[in-house]
Amino acid sequence: MKHGNYSLATMNVCSNTTKDPLTLMAMWGSMKGYNPEQGFSFEGPEKRLEVILRCTLETHVDGLRSLDDSVWSGVVGSLNAQIVSRESNEYINSYVLTESSLFVMKNRIILITCGTTTLLNSIPNILEAISAVRGELEWVSFMHKNYSFPWMQKGPHTSLADEFATLKQHFPTGKPYIFGPVDSDHYFLFCYDDIIRPCSSEDDTQLSMTMYGLDKEQTKHWFSDRFISTSAETAAIRAATHLDRVVDGTWTLHDLQFEPCGYSINAIRDEEYQTMHITPEDHCSFASYETNSRAANYSDRMKKVLGVFRPQRFTVIVFLDPESPVGKAYNEGKGIGVEPEYYPEYNLLHRTTNEFAPGYVAMKINYVRTAAVEETVTAVGGAEAGAEGGPD
Protein backbone atom coordinates (compact mmCIF):
# COMPACT_ATOMS: atom_id res chain seq x y z
CA MET A 1 0.00 0.00 0.00
CA LYS A 2 3.01 2.29 -0.21
CA HIS A 3 1.81 5.55 -1.75
CA GLY A 4 4.83 7.54 -2.80
CA ASN A 5 6.03 9.67 -5.68
CA TYR A 6 6.04 7.61 -8.87
CA SER A 7 7.16 8.58 -12.34
CA LEU A 8 4.34 9.09 -14.81
CA ALA A 9 6.58 8.24 -17.75
CA THR A 10 4.97 4.84 -18.10
CA MET A 11 1.53 6.38 -18.61
CA ASN A 12 2.26 7.09 -22.26
CA VAL A 13 3.47 3.62 -23.23
CA CYS A 14 0.02 2.06 -23.33
CA SER A 15 -0.23 1.98 -27.10
CA ASN A 16 3.27 0.48 -27.43
CA THR A 17 2.80 -2.42 -25.01
CA THR A 18 -0.69 -3.66 -25.81
CA LYS A 19 -0.17 -5.60 -29.02
CA ASP A 20 -1.05 -9.13 -27.91
CA PRO A 21 -4.70 -10.07 -27.25
CA LEU A 22 -4.07 -11.22 -23.67
CA THR A 23 -2.75 -7.79 -22.73
CA LEU A 24 -5.83 -6.18 -24.24
CA MET A 25 -8.02 -8.60 -22.32
CA ALA A 26 -6.30 -7.54 -19.10
CA MET A 27 -6.96 -3.90 -19.91
CA TRP A 28 -10.52 -3.94 -21.13
CA GLY A 29 -12.04 -3.99 -17.68
CA SER A 30 -10.46 -0.71 -16.62
CA MET A 31 -9.58 1.36 -19.67
CA LYS A 32 -13.12 2.76 -19.60
CA GLY A 33 -12.16 4.68 -16.48
CA TYR A 34 -8.80 5.93 -17.73
CA ASN A 35 -8.41 9.68 -17.36
CA PRO A 36 -5.04 11.05 -18.56
CA GLU A 37 -5.76 14.36 -16.82
CA GLN A 38 -5.89 12.68 -13.41
CA GLY A 39 -2.16 12.05 -13.05
CA PHE A 40 -0.85 9.29 -10.81
CA SER A 41 -3.26 6.59 -9.65
CA PHE A 42 -2.32 3.80 -7.27
CA GLU A 43 -2.93 0.17 -8.33
CA GLY A 44 -5.11 -1.19 -5.54
CA PRO A 45 -6.06 -4.66 -6.85
CA GLU A 46 -3.55 -7.18 -5.56
CA LYS A 47 -1.62 -10.07 -6.96
CA ARG A 48 -1.93 -13.18 -4.78
CA LEU A 49 0.41 -16.16 -4.61
CA GLU A 50 -0.30 -19.19 -2.41
CA VAL A 51 2.14 -22.07 -2.13
CA ILE A 52 1.40 -25.22 -0.13
CA LEU A 53 3.99 -27.85 0.69
CA ARG A 54 3.49 -31.51 1.48
CA CYS A 55 5.17 -32.50 4.74
CA THR A 56 7.08 -35.79 4.72
CA LEU A 57 9.05 -37.65 7.39
CA GLU A 58 12.08 -35.56 6.40
CA THR A 59 10.31 -32.19 6.63
CA HIS A 60 11.26 -29.96 9.58
CA VAL A 61 8.75 -30.42 12.40
CA ASP A 62 7.82 -26.70 12.25
CA GLY A 63 7.88 -26.59 8.47
CA LEU A 64 8.16 -23.13 6.95
CA ARG A 65 7.74 -21.45 10.34
CA SER A 66 11.16 -22.78 11.33
CA LEU A 67 12.80 -20.32 8.94
CA ASP A 68 14.24 -17.04 10.18
CA ASP A 69 12.58 -13.73 9.31
CA SER A 70 15.60 -12.91 7.16
CA VAL A 71 14.38 -15.56 4.70
CA TRP A 72 11.03 -13.82 4.38
CA SER A 73 12.72 -10.44 4.09
CA GLY A 74 14.57 -11.88 1.11
CA VAL A 75 11.35 -13.21 -0.42
CA VAL A 76 9.61 -9.87 0.01
CA GLY A 77 12.65 -7.92 -1.19
CA SER A 78 12.72 -9.89 -4.43
CA LEU A 79 9.41 -8.32 -5.43
CA ASN A 80 10.37 -4.77 -4.37
CA ALA A 81 8.65 -4.58 -0.98
CA GLN A 82 9.72 -4.63 2.68
CA ILE A 83 8.40 -6.05 5.95
CA VAL A 84 6.97 -3.34 8.21
CA SER A 85 5.67 -5.31 11.21
CA ARG A 86 5.18 -8.87 12.46
CA GLU A 87 2.76 -10.75 14.71
CA SER A 88 2.50 -14.47 15.37
CA ASN A 89 0.60 -17.14 17.23
CA GLU A 90 0.86 -20.92 17.48
CA TYR A 91 -0.10 -21.40 13.84
CA ILE A 92 0.65 -18.29 11.76
CA ASN A 93 3.37 -15.69 11.27
CA SER A 94 1.75 -12.50 9.97
CA TYR A 95 3.67 -9.72 8.23
CA VAL A 96 2.38 -6.31 7.15
CA LEU A 97 4.38 -5.16 4.14
CA THR A 98 4.97 -1.86 2.42
CA GLU A 99 2.86 -3.42 -0.33
CA SER A 100 0.17 -5.50 1.47
CA SER A 101 0.70 -8.79 3.38
CA LEU A 102 2.49 -12.08 3.94
CA PHE A 103 1.25 -15.04 5.99
CA VAL A 104 3.50 -18.00 6.78
CA MET A 105 2.14 -21.26 8.22
CA LYS A 106 3.79 -24.63 8.79
CA ASN A 107 2.89 -25.86 5.31
CA ARG A 108 1.76 -22.72 3.50
CA ILE A 109 2.77 -19.27 2.27
CA ILE A 110 0.22 -16.63 1.26
CA LEU A 111 1.75 -13.54 -0.33
CA ILE A 112 -0.51 -10.64 -1.34
CA THR A 113 0.97 -7.54 -2.97
CA CYS A 114 -0.45 -4.45 -4.63
CA GLY A 115 0.92 -1.60 -6.71
CA THR A 116 3.53 -2.49 -9.32
CA THR A 117 5.26 -5.17 -7.28
CA THR A 118 6.73 -8.04 -9.29
CA LEU A 119 5.24 -10.87 -7.26
CA LEU A 120 6.24 -13.70 -9.58
CA ASN A 121 9.90 -12.78 -9.11
CA SER A 122 9.61 -14.19 -5.58
CA ILE A 123 9.00 -17.77 -6.78
CA PRO A 124 12.69 -18.87 -6.82
CA ASN A 125 13.16 -17.65 -3.24
CA ILE A 126 9.99 -19.43 -2.10
CA LEU A 127 11.05 -22.69 -3.75
CA GLU A 128 14.41 -22.38 -1.98
CA ALA A 129 12.58 -21.96 1.33
CA ILE A 130 10.56 -25.12 0.71
CA SER A 131 13.74 -27.01 -0.15
CA ALA A 132 15.42 -25.71 3.02
CA VAL A 133 12.78 -27.37 5.23
CA ARG A 134 12.73 -30.51 3.02
CA GLY A 135 9.13 -30.14 1.97
CA GLU A 136 7.55 -31.21 -1.31
CA LEU A 137 5.59 -28.83 -3.52
CA GLU A 138 1.89 -29.75 -3.39
CA TRP A 139 -0.19 -26.79 -4.59
CA VAL A 140 0.42 -23.37 -6.13
CA SER A 141 -2.13 -20.73 -7.06
CA PHE A 142 -1.50 -17.30 -8.53
CA MET A 143 -4.44 -14.95 -8.89
CA HIS A 144 -5.23 -11.33 -9.56
CA LYS A 145 -8.19 -9.27 -10.57
CA ASN A 146 -7.85 -7.32 -13.81
CA TYR A 147 -5.52 -4.43 -13.06
CA SER A 148 -7.00 -0.95 -12.81
CA PHE A 149 -3.93 0.56 -14.51
CA PRO A 150 -2.26 -2.33 -16.37
CA TRP A 151 -0.01 -0.06 -18.42
CA MET A 152 1.81 0.77 -15.15
CA GLN A 153 2.82 -2.83 -14.41
CA LYS A 154 6.38 -4.13 -14.65
CA GLY A 155 7.56 -7.41 -16.13
CA PRO A 156 6.54 -10.17 -15.88
CA HIS A 157 3.18 -8.56 -15.08
CA THR A 158 2.82 -6.43 -18.22
CA SER A 159 0.51 -9.02 -19.81
CA LEU A 160 -1.32 -12.22 -18.98
CA ALA A 161 0.83 -13.91 -21.62
CA ASP A 162 4.03 -12.98 -19.76
CA GLU A 163 2.57 -14.01 -16.41
CA PHE A 164 1.45 -17.33 -17.85
CA ALA A 165 4.85 -17.98 -19.46
CA THR A 166 6.64 -17.27 -16.17
CA LEU A 167 4.33 -19.57 -14.23
CA LYS A 168 4.63 -22.39 -16.78
CA GLN A 169 8.40 -22.12 -16.58
CA HIS A 170 8.26 -22.94 -12.87
CA PHE A 171 5.17 -25.18 -12.85
CA PRO A 172 4.85 -26.84 -16.29
CA THR A 173 1.67 -28.80 -15.51
CA GLY A 174 -0.23 -25.82 -14.10
CA LYS A 175 -3.43 -24.61 -15.75
CA PRO A 176 -4.75 -21.04 -16.38
CA TYR A 177 -8.34 -19.87 -15.98
CA ILE A 178 -10.27 -16.62 -16.40
CA PHE A 179 -13.29 -16.00 -14.19
CA GLY A 180 -15.77 -13.47 -15.50
CA PRO A 181 -16.18 -11.31 -18.61
CA VAL A 182 -12.88 -10.24 -20.15
CA ASP A 183 -14.28 -6.76 -20.89
CA SER A 184 -15.26 -6.15 -17.26
CA ASP A 185 -14.37 -7.27 -13.73
CA HIS A 186 -12.59 -10.63 -14.03
CA TYR A 187 -9.87 -12.72 -12.41
CA PHE A 188 -6.88 -14.51 -13.85
CA LEU A 189 -6.12 -17.72 -11.95
CA PHE A 190 -3.27 -20.17 -12.42
CA CYS A 191 -3.24 -23.45 -10.48
CA TYR A 192 -0.63 -26.16 -10.05
CA ASP A 193 -2.06 -29.25 -8.32
CA ASP A 194 0.04 -32.18 -7.08
CA ILE A 195 -2.21 -33.18 -4.18
CA ILE A 196 -2.14 -36.93 -3.60
CA ARG A 197 -5.80 -37.94 -3.42
CA PRO A 198 -7.62 -39.17 -1.52
CA CYS A 199 -5.90 -37.07 1.11
CA SER A 200 -6.70 -36.87 4.82
CA SER A 201 -8.65 -33.64 4.55
CA GLU A 202 -9.56 -30.95 2.06
CA ASP A 203 -11.30 -28.32 4.15
CA ASP A 204 -9.74 -25.01 3.10
CA THR A 205 -11.80 -21.92 2.33
CA GLN A 206 -11.00 -18.46 1.03
CA LEU A 207 -13.31 -15.46 0.83
CA SER A 208 -12.00 -12.42 -1.07
CA MET A 209 -13.72 -9.12 -1.82
CA THR A 210 -12.57 -6.26 -4.04
CA MET A 211 -14.49 -2.99 -3.69
CA TYR A 212 -14.52 0.18 -5.80
CA GLY A 213 -16.04 3.64 -5.40
CA LEU A 214 -15.77 3.80 -1.61
CA ASP A 215 -17.86 6.16 0.53
CA LYS A 216 -16.03 9.49 0.93
CA GLU A 217 -17.22 9.80 4.53
CA GLN A 218 -15.20 6.66 5.24
CA THR A 219 -12.15 7.22 3.05
CA LYS A 220 -11.37 10.57 4.70
CA HIS A 221 -10.12 8.64 7.73
CA TRP A 222 -7.31 6.96 5.78
CA PHE A 223 -5.30 10.08 4.96
CA SER A 224 -2.39 11.16 7.16
CA ASP A 225 0.63 13.45 7.20
CA ARG A 226 2.78 10.65 8.70
CA PHE A 227 3.08 6.90 8.99
CA ILE A 228 1.28 5.47 12.03
CA SER A 229 1.85 1.88 13.15
CA THR A 230 -0.33 -0.13 15.53
CA SER A 231 -1.24 2.17 18.41
CA ALA A 232 -4.08 4.04 20.08
CA GLU A 233 -4.18 6.25 16.98
CA THR A 234 -4.83 3.35 14.62
CA ALA A 235 -7.36 1.97 17.11
CA ALA A 236 -9.20 5.29 16.84
CA ILE A 237 -9.22 4.93 13.04
CA ARG A 238 -10.66 1.43 13.35
CA ALA A 239 -13.36 2.67 15.71
CA ALA A 240 -14.29 5.69 13.56
CA THR A 241 -14.63 3.57 10.42
CA HIS A 242 -16.20 0.53 12.16
CA LEU A 243 -13.31 -1.69 11.11
CA ASP A 244 -13.40 -2.88 14.71
CA ARG A 245 -16.69 -4.61 13.91
CA VAL A 246 -14.89 -6.73 11.32
CA VAL A 247 -11.74 -7.29 13.39
CA ASP A 248 -12.96 -7.45 16.98
CA GLY A 249 -11.08 -8.06 20.20
CA THR A 250 -10.81 -11.82 19.65
CA TRP A 251 -8.16 -11.23 16.96
CA THR A 252 -4.47 -10.37 17.30
CA LEU A 253 -3.91 -7.53 14.86
CA HIS A 254 -1.30 -5.17 13.50
CA ASP A 255 -2.02 -2.30 11.15
CA LEU A 256 -0.41 0.64 9.40
CA GLN A 257 -1.69 4.03 8.31
CA PHE A 258 0.40 5.20 5.36
CA GLU A 259 1.51 8.74 4.49
CA PRO A 260 -0.06 10.52 2.67
CA CYS A 261 -2.81 7.90 2.42
CA GLY A 262 -3.58 4.21 2.46
CA TYR A 263 -4.11 1.65 5.18
CA SER A 264 -3.34 -2.04 5.79
CA ILE A 265 -4.37 -4.43 8.55
CA ASN A 266 -3.61 -8.08 9.27
CA ALA A 267 -5.36 -10.11 11.97
CA ILE A 268 -4.86 -13.69 13.14
CA ARG A 269 -6.84 -15.97 15.46
CA ASP A 270 -5.69 -19.56 15.85
CA GLU A 271 -5.48 -20.88 12.26
CA GLU A 272 -7.59 -18.07 10.78
CA TYR A 273 -6.49 -14.79 9.24
CA GLN A 274 -8.07 -11.59 7.94
CA THR A 275 -6.42 -8.89 5.87
CA MET A 276 -7.62 -5.58 4.43
CA HIS A 277 -5.92 -3.00 2.23
CA ILE A 278 -7.33 0.40 1.39
CA THR A 279 -6.57 2.94 -1.34
CA PRO A 280 -8.70 5.99 -0.42
CA GLU A 281 -8.06 8.51 -3.24
CA ASP A 282 -11.41 9.48 -4.68
CA HIS A 283 -10.52 8.93 -8.35
CA CYS A 284 -9.24 5.37 -7.72
CA SER A 285 -10.71 4.40 -4.34
CA PHE A 286 -10.40 0.71 -3.67
CA ALA A 287 -10.44 -1.76 -0.79
CA SER A 288 -9.74 -5.46 -0.57
CA TYR A 289 -10.65 -8.00 2.06
CA GLU A 290 -9.62 -11.64 2.47
CA THR A 291 -10.11 -14.32 5.10
CA ASN A 292 -9.94 -18.06 5.53
CA SER A 293 -12.39 -17.97 8.45
CA ARG A 294 -14.53 -21.06 8.77
CA ALA A 295 -18.26 -20.50 8.37
CA ALA A 296 -21.17 -22.18 6.63
CA ASN A 297 -22.53 -18.81 5.49
CA TYR A 298 -20.54 -15.63 4.77
CA SER A 299 -23.37 -13.08 4.76
CA ASP A 300 -22.73 -11.65 8.25
CA ARG A 301 -19.05 -11.12 7.55
CA MET A 302 -19.63 -9.66 4.10
CA LYS A 303 -22.29 -7.25 5.38
CA LYS A 304 -19.89 -5.98 8.04
CA VAL A 305 -17.20 -5.39 5.40
CA LEU A 306 -19.63 -3.66 3.05
CA GLY A 307 -20.83 -1.55 5.97
CA VAL A 308 -17.31 -0.19 6.40
CA PHE A 309 -16.64 0.73 2.77
CA ARG A 310 -20.13 1.20 1.22
CA PRO A 311 -18.74 0.61 -2.29
CA GLN A 312 -20.44 1.47 -5.56
CA ARG A 313 -19.49 -1.95 -6.87
CA PHE A 314 -17.75 -5.03 -5.59
CA THR A 315 -16.60 -8.48 -6.63
CA VAL A 316 -16.60 -11.49 -4.32
CA ILE A 317 -14.68 -14.66 -5.03
CA VAL A 318 -14.97 -17.81 -2.94
CA PHE A 319 -12.78 -20.89 -3.02
CA LEU A 320 -14.04 -23.84 -1.02
CA ASP A 321 -13.05 -27.43 -0.41
CA PRO A 322 -15.75 -30.10 -0.09
CA GLU A 323 -15.08 -30.81 3.59
CA SER A 324 -15.16 -27.18 4.74
CA PRO A 325 -18.32 -25.88 6.47
CA VAL A 326 -19.16 -23.62 3.52
CA GLY A 327 -18.29 -26.40 1.08
CA LYS A 328 -20.69 -28.78 2.78
CA ALA A 329 -23.43 -26.11 2.75
CA TYR A 330 -22.86 -25.45 -0.95
CA ASN A 331 -22.96 -29.14 -1.85
CA GLU A 332 -26.21 -29.52 0.13
CA GLY A 333 -27.78 -26.79 -2.00
CA LYS A 334 -27.87 -24.21 0.78
CA GLY A 335 -27.07 -20.51 0.43
CA ILE A 336 -23.54 -19.62 1.48
CA GLY A 337 -24.05 -15.88 1.92
CA VAL A 338 -22.77 -14.60 -1.41
CA GLU A 339 -26.09 -14.84 -3.29
CA PRO A 340 -28.10 -11.76 -4.43
CA GLU A 341 -30.91 -12.20 -1.89
CA TYR A 342 -28.51 -11.21 0.88
CA TYR A 343 -27.68 -7.83 -0.73
CA PRO A 344 -30.89 -6.11 -1.90
CA GLU A 345 -29.12 -2.76 -2.27
CA TYR A 346 -26.94 -4.25 -5.03
CA ASN A 347 -27.68 -5.72 -8.46
CA LEU A 348 -25.95 -8.89 -9.61
CA LEU A 349 -24.05 -8.23 -12.85
CA HIS A 350 -22.32 -11.54 -13.46
CA ARG A 351 -21.71 -14.87 -11.78
CA THR A 352 -19.16 -17.56 -12.67
CA THR A 353 -18.78 -20.94 -10.97
CA ASN A 354 -16.06 -23.49 -11.72
CA GLU A 355 -15.98 -26.91 -10.11
CA PHE A 356 -12.67 -28.75 -9.97
CA ALA A 357 -12.28 -32.41 -9.03
CA PRO A 358 -12.75 -33.58 -6.38
CA GLY A 359 -15.47 -31.08 -5.50
CA TYR A 360 -13.24 -28.00 -5.24
CA VAL A 361 -15.35 -24.96 -6.17
CA ALA A 362 -14.40 -21.43 -7.24
CA MET A 363 -17.21 -18.88 -7.47
CA LYS A 364 -16.98 -15.23 -8.59
CA ILE A 365 -19.83 -12.71 -8.46
CA ASN A 366 -19.91 -9.06 -9.58
CA TYR A 367 -22.32 -6.63 -7.90
CA VAL A 368 -23.13 -2.96 -8.50
CA ARG A 369 -25.09 -0.67 -6.19
CA THR A 370 -28.75 -0.45 -7.25
CA ALA A 371 -28.74 3.35 -7.19
CA ALA A 372 -25.83 3.41 -9.65
CA VAL A 373 -27.75 1.16 -12.03
CA GLU A 374 -30.85 3.33 -11.77
CA GLU A 375 -28.82 6.49 -12.43
CA THR A 376 -27.30 4.91 -15.55
CA VAL A 377 -30.70 3.82 -16.85
CA THR A 378 -32.15 7.28 -16.17
CA ALA A 379 -29.25 8.99 -17.94
CA VAL A 380 -29.57 6.72 -20.97
CA GLY A 381 -33.33 7.22 -21.05
CA GLY A 382 -32.94 10.98 -20.83
CA ALA A 383 -30.39 11.01 -23.63
CA GLU A 384 -32.68 8.94 -25.85
CA ALA A 385 -35.63 11.21 -25.09
CA GLY A 386 -33.52 14.25 -25.90
CA ALA A 387 -32.47 12.73 -29.20
CA GLU A 388 -36.07 11.94 -30.12
CA GLY A 389 -37.27 15.39 -29.13
CA GLY A 390 -34.60 17.36 -30.96
CA PRO A 391 -35.21 20.13 -33.44
CA ASP A 392 -37.21 19.23 -36.55
From Swiss-Prot:
Pfam families xref list: SAM_decarbox
Post-translational modification: Is synthesized initially as an inactive proenzyme. Formation of the active enzyme involves a self-maturation process in which the active site pyruvoyl group is generated from an internal serine residue via an autocatalytic post-translational modification. Two non-identical subunits are generated from the proenzyme in this reaction, and the pyruvate is formed at the N-terminus of the alpha chain, which is derived from the carboxyl end of the proenzyme.
Keywords: Autocatalytic cleavage, Decarboxylase, Lyase, Polyamine biosynthesis, Pyruvate, S-adenosyl-L-methionine, Schiff base, Spermidine biosynthesis, Zymogen
Signal peptide annotation: none
An example Gene Ontology biological process: spermidine biosynthetic process
Active site: E43, E46, S100, C114, S264, H277
Enzyme Commission number(s): 4.1.1.50
One GO MF term attached to the UniProt entry: adenosylmethionine decarboxylase activity
Enzymatic reactions: S-adenosyl-L-methionine + H(+) = S-adenosyl 3-(methylsulfanyl)propylamine + CO2
Needed co-factor(s): pyruvate
Cofactor stoichiometry and binding remark: Binds 1 pyruvoyl group covalently per subunit.
GO CC annotation: cytosol
This protein's pathway: Amine and polyamine biosynthesis; S-adenosylmethioninamine biosynthesis; S-adenosylmethioninamine from S-adenosyl-L-methionine: step 1/1
Site (Cleavage (non-hydrolytic)): E99, S100
Residue positions where Pyruvic acid (Ser) is found in the record: S100
InterPro entries, per the entry: AdoMetDC-like (IPR048283), S-AdoMet_decarboxylase_euk (IPR001985), S-AdoMet_deCO2ase_core (IPR016067), S-AdoMet_deCO2ase_CS (IPR018166)
UniProt record similarity statement: Belongs to the eukaryotic AdoMetDC family.
Protein name, UniProt field: S-adenosylmethionine decarboxylase proenzyme
